[in-house]
């Protein structure tokens, strides 16, 4: 059984880049190939995944309404399985070697303290230390890469709000996360824009509504493509240019924007 001693925990100071060297070394030994972990899975897993203990063994569970992306993850990683329920599906990993692979994939590459704590607790609850693992407990600094794209697939959305009098329109990029204050402060610094809202149960929301700052969000997702159906919402980004050109000031333009807003909001469910 995989385990770790408490003194094998590192604070990993000044971490700013994702690292997958140990993961790819172990992965290549098992599958005779390497995998590009920058596919966004780490961010997606950090947003919606759970690593814990079930029946005294570590288990990783990723829950999603959209089963298609879970099957893509399974086929890309070459391990785990997908179980479908009535209104959602789960990607599940239980075997020892695959959990070890996930450990190296996540270790030092997570942004949220409570997700790092899951990693610590799930490993520390195992009595042996067969693999001599060291856990990095310092959150990695946020940077714009595929990991944040995956995180947005899990926890973000694009939203269009049209006022009741049909005269005003607001475009929003939103990300929600429990214990997300530190992460969202970094995101606000990177974008030099956005607002952070405290919600119930230590949940936080980050939102960008400034039309001039949204171009930075658009540029990012042009470079790092979303893998969920939220990509379909993003592809309606022509609405941004319509608002920038004040097309909503005309009756014809507002009707066009209403149609686009329906499509954007629909693909964020």
Where are these regions (language model features)?
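Internal intein/HINT superfamily modules and their associated LAGLIDADG
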Residues: 1-269
